[in-house]
Design a protein with these regions (language model features):
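Outer-membrane beta-barrel translocator/channel fold
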Residues: 77-139, 185-237, 249, 333-378, ...
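Outer-membrane beta-barrel channels and translocator barrels
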Residues: 69-71, 148-150, 179-181, 234-236, ...
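Extracellular loop and loop/strand-boundary signature of outer-membrane beta-barrel proteins
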Residues: 47-50, 125-129, 156-160, 171-175, ...
């Protein structure tokens, strides 16, 4: 369930609703929106693969959008992705072979009638479950319309299901234009409900890995709000400022993550299931800009995020769309991300220390920097059609990768991630 990388933000539905409103008001202040438009269909096939034979994802996407006139718009998206490959389980490399069981197993000791699938990691290698495979189906449906003069309402829902995780969410947002439609204020909310039913059962947090103590299905709730302002700065410049706040409560632990327990020398002495707090508050401030630069359009944004787990982050994202011919464009893309580690993040747990109440070795909670560099090429074909190809490289570099303990010296405890993204897209109106 939570082994997939990267996970979408929990407030994605809220962001989509609010941004859609912002874009349909200030960004369209000088357009006529009372005329019905054709159906717009966008399809894409995304392929993501991590180096060294880790996770790979194949994801077809279909989006349908229809403007019925008078700014009454329906927008629906369907995603079906398949993930497979090897996924790190949270333990660190060791000088000796290590044996683990896949999550659906019931024991580390094979015996008659037992549902057990074991895998052994050779010395010096990062423990990864080679049996990881998951399919996810997700859909979003949103509707937006005017409410009174210079105001808009948007609302929608989201459903997602996979073998061990189900999610349902609703969102709504309102916006109002003023200052001759050069300024738009927006506010919205999002409510999400998730069910977690891990393969083999949800482990009791912080318990001994070898005991296989499991409990029933778990749930979590996420509630969020967003407020924003969009301003037409000039004929060529549109700026947007958003503040978001969301609170998660319930089962926030990853049921498939463990931690290594080591002695004073760094030798492996066992494993513990991870344990996370049962609540999390996250806040972010976003500043976005779209600037027309002759035959090019610059999209530059900065986001500052923080939460009560101690994870503080900075994101700079830039796209530059360049018209290289009448019917062709190039769009270079650079994204830089940095975050601090969660307060309870540990590469491993020392046997001599008191067992922490909260602990996780999930690399997504570690301190790291991530960089995405790529380019998108698009060409108009046929009548109102467009074909596009996107190529990107992603690299994640952890800050903490080594240990001074004797048995762990020279081992790469958190090697990071390198991945390639290829996406082919098609857009057509009819």
């Amino acid at each position: 369930m939570q082994l997939k990388r990267p996970n979408p933000p929990l407030q994605l539905g809220l962001m989509a609703a609010s941004c859609a409103l912002l874009g349909s008001t200030a960004a369209q202040a000088q357009t006529v929106a009372d005329k019905a438009l054709p159906w717009q269909v966008e399809t894409a096939l995304l392929y993501y693969k991590e180096n060294a034979g880790l996770l790979q994802t194949i994801e077809p996407i279909v989006n349908l959008k229809k403007d019925f006139g008078d700014q009454r718009v329906v927008d629906g998206t369907f995603i079906l992705d398949t993930m497979s490959g090897a996924s790190p389980n949270g333990a660190i490399p060791s000088r000796k072979p290590q044996t683990f069981a896949s999550p659906s197993s019931t024991s580390l000791t094979p015996r008659a009638g037992a549902k057990t699938k074991l895998y052994t990691i050779t010395p010096g290698n990062l423990p990864e479950d080679p049996h990881f495979k998951e399919q996810r189906a997700a859909g979003d449906l949103d509707w937006s319309q005017p409410i009174g003069i210079d105001s808009n309402l948007s609302y929608g829902g989201h459903l997602s299901t996979e073998h061990d995780f189900n999610s349902a969410a609703v969102n709504a947002a309102v916006s109002h234009d003023f200052n001759n439609k050069n300024t738009t204020l927006s506010a919205g909310f999002n409510e999400e409900y998730d069910q977690i039913h891990a393969r083999g059962g949800n482990p009791v947090p912080a318990t001994d890995y070898t005991l296989y103590e499991k409990e029933g299905n778990q749930t979590k709730n996420v509630a969020g709000v967003l407020v924003g302002v969009t301003q037409v700065m000039s004929r060529n410049w549109l700026a947007q400022l958003n503040y978001s706040y969301d609170r998660s409560q319930g089962y926030l632990t990853d049921p498939y993550r463990i931690l290594s327990v080591v002695d004073a020398s760094g030798a492996e002495m066992g494993y513990r299931y991870e344990s996370r707090p049962d609540s999390r508050v996250r806040q972010s401030l976003y500043l976005g800009n779209k600037v027309a630069l002759g035959p090019a359009v610059l999209d530059l944004s900065y986001r500052r995020g923080k939460d009560d787990w101690g994870v503080n982050s900075d994101t700079v994202d830039t796209h530059l769309r360049i018209d290289v011919a009448r019917d062709m464009y190039l769009e270079p893309h650079v994204r830089w991300y940095r975050q601090s580690a969660a307060d309870f993040y540990h590469l491993y747990v020392n046997q001599a220390d008191p067992l922490p109440t909260d602990m996780s070795a999930d690399p997504r909670l570690a301190a790291f920097t991530g960089t995405t560099i790529g380019v998108k090429f698009g060409v108009k074909v046929a009548h109102s059609g467009e074909l596009s190809l996107r190529l990107e490289e992603y690299q994640q570099k952890p800050t903490d990768r080594s240990s001074p303990l004797t048995e762990l010296q020279g081992l790469d405890l958190n090697p990071g991630i390198k991945g390639t993204i290829v996406q082919i897209g098609w857009r057509q109106e009819f």
